[in-house]
Amino acid sequence: MKRLARSLYLQVLLAVVLGALVGHLFPATGASLKPLGDGFIKLVKMLIAPIVFATVVTGIAKMGDLRKVGRVGLKGLLYFEVLTTVALAIGLVVARLARPGAGMNVDPATLDTKAIASYTNGAQAHGTVDFLMNVIPRDVADAFARGDILQVLLFSVLFGAALAALKDKGRPVLEFVDGLSLVLFRIVGFVMRLAPVGAFGAMAFTVGKYGIATLLSLGKLIACFYATSALFVVLMLGLVLRWCGLSLFRFLRYIKEEIFVVLGTSSSESALPLMMRKMEKLGCSKPVVGLVVPMGYSFNLDGTSIYLTLATLFIAQATNTHVTLVQELEILAVLLLTSKGAAAVTGGGFITLAATLSAVGNIPVAGLALLLGVDRFMSEARAITNLIGNGVASVAVSRWEGELDQARARAVLAGTVPEEVEPANEPEPPAVPAGAGLHG
């Protein structure tokens, strides 16, 4: 009982189980508990923009070398492109081999498209050009108010670069932002005490509204997706961590609290603040974490990438739409663009899938109606895979930059270093002599 009182992940796990039971036994009550999950996610999202700002600004300003900032960003984008391409390809291969939609013989004309109208209409506004232009905020206040991670990240990089260029004159501002970061993460600690409540409400709503019967009706597709996501984590991400000299299973145990929070809320964004702090404590470079993790929430959605190719071919198979190998490669090419616009929030993958089907053309968009009921049950695996992928990305880019404290990382994963201890590569910044840059 004492362990339950101290352990967040056990509390969240218990809340998820209880939420599923309430949703199954009392569907109407479960469906009415949605505000608990939504409220928790809103509390976390309230903190994401200022945390990204504070972390990125202090990281870049202390780094001093602006060429290094560009190098880290480019390495991060290259890593994201390779891993998400592999994830898309794996989803495509599994869909071809397992054929989860074969034999359903669905006539697209008989499907009710009213329920998916909001997704298809929203997808029209998520084109590649719109996405790229949206990285530039209309104004800074608007970016922070809406919590747009990429817009906040762009402003934060510019702000941090300006602080580094100001050198000594920027020291008071840097110290203020550094202190702000400590306050924000303390607030995160307060908010995370409500994680079990949010997980309970979100799970009760999911099971209460959609029911176990919906889950069983498309069991083959769900099983394929969960198995493929697990395979990607174990093989691909495990291989990356092995290159970094770390154990995948110890890494997963280290981030178990974040995994269970995401499991309960179906949103990898709900664990972003905790994940950034965990990666710093693991021994990753703070500037790398500040750049890579926020960018990853738009460019490194491995779980969503697997889902997109798997779901696209599932709809084609279910509606008896013949897709040639050339067309599959075209789908892959389209998804290389549209998947980068998938938000790390619940439902983002579904909207991106609608955009992809619209762009491809030969697969009926009406087929989305087949997924509407079960999509929510697959969002947990999407979000967890996205979370793990972004954590591994920060480790990999830190290792690539030569700024991963491997000895500390192994000790932390082995449990021989208390998590409360600040990372060894983040000492208190010394006084900066005249004419020097703002190095940490």
UniProtKB/Swiss-Prot annotation:
<feature type="transmembrane region" description="Helical">
    <location>
        <begin position="74"/>
        <end position="94"/>
    </location>
</feature>
<comment type="function">
    <text>Responsible for the transport of dicarboxylates such as succinate, fumarate, and malate from the periplasm across the membrane.</text>
</comment>
<dbReference type="InterPro" id="IPR023954">
    <property type="entry name" value="C4_dicarb_transport"/>
</dbReference>
<dbReference type="GO" id="GO:0015366">
    <property type="term" value="F:malate:proton symporter activity"/>
</dbReference>
<keyword id="KW-0997">Cell inner membrane</keyword>
<dbReference type="InterPro" id="IPR036458">
    <property type="entry name" value="Na:dicarbo_symporter_sf"/>
</dbReference>
<keyword id="KW-0472">Membrane</keyword>
<keyword id="KW-1003">Cell membrane</keyword>
<dbReference type="InterPro" id="IPR001991">
    <property type="entry name" value="Na-dicarboxylate_symporter"/>
</dbReference>
<feature type="transmembrane region" description="Helical">
    <location>
        <begin position="8"/>
        <end position="28"/>
    </location>
</feature>
<feature type="transmembrane region" description="Helical">
    <location>
        <begin position="147"/>
        <end position="167"/>
    </location>
</feature>
<keyword id="KW-0769">Symport</keyword>
<protein>
    <recommendedName>
        <fullName>C4-dicarboxylate transport protein</fullName>
    </recommendedName>
</protein>
<dbReference type="Pfam" id="PF00375">
    <property type="entry name" value="SDF"/>
</dbReference>
<keyword id="KW-0813">Transport</keyword>
<dbReference type="InterPro" id="IPR018107">
    <property type="entry name" value="Na-dicarboxylate_symporter_CS"/>
</dbReference>
<keyword id="KW-1133">Transmembrane helix</keyword>
<dbReference type="GO" id="GO:0015141">
    <property type="term" value="F:succinate transmembrane transporter activity"/>
</dbReference>
<feature type="transmembrane region" description="Helical">
    <location>
        <begin position="221"/>
        <end position="241"/>
    </location>
</feature>
<feature type="transmembrane region" description="Helical">
    <location>
        <begin position="40"/>
        <end position="60"/>
    </location>
</feature>
<keyword id="KW-0812">Transmembrane</keyword>
<dbReference type="GO" id="GO:0070778">
    <property type="term" value="P:L-aspartate transmembrane transport"/>
</dbReference>
<dbReference type="GO" id="GO:0015138">
    <property type="term" value="F:fumarate transmembrane transporter activity"/>
</dbReference>
<feature type="transmembrane region" description="Helical">
    <location>
        <begin position="288"/>
        <end position="308"/>
    </location>
</feature>
<dbReference type="GO" id="GO:0005886">
    <property type="term" value="C:plasma membrane"/>
</dbReference>
<feature type="region of interest" description="Disordered">
    <location>
        <begin position="419"/>
        <end position="440"/>
    </location>
</feature>
<comment type="similarity">
    <text>Belongs to the dicarboxylate/amino acid:cation symporter (DAACS) (TC 2.A.23) family.</text>
</comment>
<feature type="transmembrane region" description="Helical">
    <location>
        <begin position="354"/>
        <end position="374"/>
    </location>
</feature>
<feature type="transmembrane region" description="Helical">
    <location>
        <begin position="187"/>
        <end position="207"/>
    </location>
</feature>
